[in-house]
Amino acid sequence: MNRPLTPVLLFLAILAVPLIGPRLFAQASNLRVNNEKPEKGGQSKRIHPHGLKLILQGKKKEAIAYLNKYKDDKVNPEQTQMLIDLALEKPNAWKFDAKTWPWKRTLPNTSLKKDAPSDKFTIAFGGGAGYVPPHERMWDTIGAIDPRALLLLGDNVYIDDPKTPEMQLFHYYRRQSQPEWAKLAKKVPIYAIWDDHDFTTNDGWGGPAIDEPKWKRDVWKIFKDNWDNPYYGGGEKQPGCWFDFWIGKVHFVLIDGRYYRESPKGKNPSMLGPAQMKWLKKTLKEPATFTVFCTNVPVTPKVKPGSKDT
């Protein structure tokens, strides 16, 4: 932000689309989980998720043969070995939980930097942070500016597999085990909302129902376990990842554009759902020197050519 605070109410974005409409196309999108071998698209970072998927499908011999091809690869060979041990059913193999994960994890801690801010402070915004080993240095780049907080606005990991909790845990744990991430998370508060790739699959939506499809609540619980937001939507009765918080007199409002989103093919589809919309209208009325409104997708139609995912 890096500027003196003045008594002005600032909205960084304006809701420019109808968010409440009739319950047309009121179901979740079809999942498009891509299990193709990652080398077909040069996606070497997907080697381990593909190997894990084979293991979870019971194709352990195929997984071992596949992973052995990359055993000496420079891309996290220790993780390759971990998955081979998992496929071999070794007694000390990872058991799909935090306790048996082989490496130390560093989770976000939003209780950091709670002292009163000065009239100038810096906020970092990010997202679209799929795991690419050579690019993990980005956390060092962010840490170098020593922001008051980092706000991650979705696609913070690329899971694309909402029905498979083991896959979700692997992606979170892998990121939390990286030294660059650990260094940043130990000194900067990190807040997060999700988008399609860490909630569902590409350009997907959850639909208006709280517990349909059944995977929605499970994805939400894993998200909660791996971030440290002040609260998560309306809690158990109304799951979601929307929340707000303050730094001094600056009000940060972050919304959830996936859990209750309806099909963009319907007439006047909702992006937020009625409960979140009610919360948002009330929250935006709170007086602040600045109100910073954060969303996982553009809120203006037609800004993504060829896509209605706004």
Which sequence ranges carry the predicted segments?
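Acidic, histidine-bearing metal-coordination/catalytic regions of metal-dependent phosphoesterases
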Residues: L24, A28-E39, Q43-R46, H50-N68, ...
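Metal-dependent phosphoester/phosphodiester hydrolase catalytic core
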Residues: P91-T310
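A conserved position within tetratricopeptide repeats
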Residues: K71-D72
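Bacterial N-terminal signal peptides
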Residues: L9-L19
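Bacterial N-terminal signal peptides that target proteins for export
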Residues: M1-L10
